[in-house]
Regions:
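Accessory regions of macromolecular translocation/handling assemblies
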Residues: 1-187, 250, 265, 273, ...
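P-loop NTPase motor domains
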Residues: 22, 92, 96, 134-137, ...
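Conserved ATP-driven motor cores of ASCE-family P-loop NTPases powering translocation/secretion/packaging/pilus
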Residues: 206-211, 387-506
Length: 519
């Protein structure tokens, strides 16, 4: 049977198919202009002739029998077709040759390599369908994209795997979307929002177990913010809150309503005995009435949500105690109408939790901090430094934002860029432009530039002189040019469809084009 297949027209047809099919496959995977020749027999015939010579030499040198003949033919011809096509598409005009800088790969290519390298690692998380190496988890995640592009979809995919393997998490949860998806009372999950009937009641005084905890609490409630005239007044307000809160704790007055009254409404006569002998005493001097009024204005604005907590009828709750000994997930849900009142308090709770996580013994005690709208929340004081240190204590941060300018407005340009740099895993979805480039320009710069060698083909046609013999002739020339360009232009990022973007994991040198799927 083998003899009948390999002789005459049957043999030629089989050899042609063994070369041509892999050749066409390799063409379809390339991006070169040579695709237009895919139906031409010239290339396949040339490869077929070369492969035939190699097969003849191998058969003669091995003195092969029928079975070996079949093996040589069935292996050599397809390999010659496939790799010949890959070489042609790689080297042809219209296909850039990467020299250095940012590399981009297709989603399917990365999925194949991830599967090959990780082999279905038990408990491995995925982001956009791509496996996240365990060592990358503690290098934190940033997700950049405008509304509706898929940030929440990506976070749900990532956190679903984390919770399935027993990790704990804290969500700053816009509109309660993560609560609706993940809440499980049997797991010990907790809701924290003074406006939510299902919420526990935050006990501010339970966060104070050491003398220095008062300063930490004041810093969380009234962050320093960026440089400017307001920074000094926030410093005065922290000094005032620290002094009054410490005296209340020392005297056993653990009544949040009374603390709120002292901070915002008590007379100078009531306050003076409390702050005497503290750094806040000068604020109560007779010639400092206007200064005290300004300090109270800053304090009341920053701590406004504390006014609503005493009215709750719920079990007392400590964020620090939950980080040390709690179970499940802590949800901090908020509605759009509540954000003005809760912004500072949510940021304070996240800050308390992050710094308590760094007070634990070093080790991989997996705890996720998820902030889906970093640019909508207030300043989480110390976030920049915490991102650099949390990994030693098992902390993993997932930060999503729409606008880099809004993050810069909240944290200051320098700190905002440090926060971005400290998140080693990046997912970029569609971003908006604004005057000066906006977030799309920032995202393009984040992906980076690349240098490529670009082959450019020029076509020419010459015509014979008048009355001369011969027809016109066609000439083609190829020139190679070194080009440095943005790997992904800002305008490309602005035009991305929903659920489509670019992913880079911390341990991977290349960016991957990805498509998210709803879960």
């Amino acid at each position: 049977m083998w003899e009948s297949l390999t002789h005459g027209w049957n043999g030629l047809a089989m050899a042609w198919l063994l070369v041509a099919v892999p050749l066409w496959v390799s063409f379809s995977q390339g991006n070169a202009a040579i695709r237009q020749w895919v139906l031409s027999p010239v290339i396949a015939l040339a490869i077929l002739f070369g492969a035939g010579l190699c097969v003849s030499v191998l058969q003669a040198s091995l003195n092969a029998g029928t079975v070996m003949d079949a093996a040589i033919v069935l292996v050599c011809f397809p390999l010659a077709g496939y790799f010949g096509g890959r070489y042609l598409t790689r080297s042809s005009a219209g296909n850039d040759i990467h020299k250095r800088g940012t590399r981009l790969r297709e989603d399917t290519e990365h999925r194949r390599s991830s599967t090959r390298l990780d082999g279905g690692h038990a408990g491995q998380l995925t982001l956009a369908g791509v496996g996240v190496p365990p060592e990358d988890e503690t290098k934190h995640f940033k997700l950049i994209g405008t509304t509706g592009t898929g940030k929440s979809t990506a976070i749900r995919e990532l956190i679903t795997g984390a919770l399935d393997r027993g990790d704990r998490a804290i969500f700053a949860d816009p509109d309660g979307g993560y609560r609706a998806r993940f809440y499980d009372a049997s797991r010990g999950d907790v809701i924290l929002n003074p406006f939510d009937p299902a919420s526990v009641k935050w006990d501010l005084f339970a966060e104070i177990t050491n003398p220095y905890d008062v300063e930490q609490l004041a810093n969380a409630l009234i962050p320093a913010g960026d440089e400017g005239p307001g920074r000094e007044w926030r410093g005065y307000a922290r000094t005032f809150v620290t002094a009054v809160t410490r005296r209340c704790k020392q005297s056993g007055t653990h009544d949040l309503a009374e603390l709120w009254r002292l901070l915002t409404a008590a007379s100078s006569e009531d306050l003076l005995p409390i702050v005497t002998g503290t750094p806040a005493q000068p604020f109560l001097e007779s010639n400092s009435a206007k200064m005290l009024s300004n300090i109270r204005s800053v304090t009341g604005s920053a701590l406004s949500a504390l006014e609503y907590i005493p009215a709750q009828n719920a079990a007392p709750f400590s964020v620090r105690e939950w980080v040390r000994n709690g179970r499940g997930v802590l949800f901090i849900p908020y509605q759009a109408a509540q954000i003005a009142a809760l912004r500072g308090l949510i940021a304070a709770w996240m800050r308390i939790a992050i710094f308590e996580a760094m007070s634990r013994p070093e080790g991989d005690q997996r705890l996720w901090f998820v902030v889906d709208e970093l640019d909508a929340l207030g300043n989480i004081d110390g976030l920049k430094d915490a991102l650099a240190r949390l990994r030693k204590f098992g902390g993993r941060c997932v930060l999503g934002f729409q606008s880099i300018s809004q993050v810069s407005s909240t944290y200051g340009p320098g700190e905002a860029h440090t926060i971005v740099e400290n998140c080693g895993n990046s997912l970029i979805l569609r971003c908006s432009a604004s005057e000066g480039g906006g977030t799309s320009r920032f995202a393009s710069q984040l992906i980076g530039d690349r240098e490529v060698v670009r082959a450019e083909v020029s076509h020419g046609r010459s015509h014979p002189a008048f009355l001369s013999r011969g027809g016109s002739s066609v000439s083609n020339s190829v020139t190679h040019r070194h080009v440095t360009e943005a790997a992904v232009m800002a305008s490309q990022i602005e035009q991305l469809p929903d659920l489509t973007g670019f992913l880079k994991l911390a341990s991977d040198p290349a960016w991957t084009r990805i498509v998210l799927t709803h879960r």
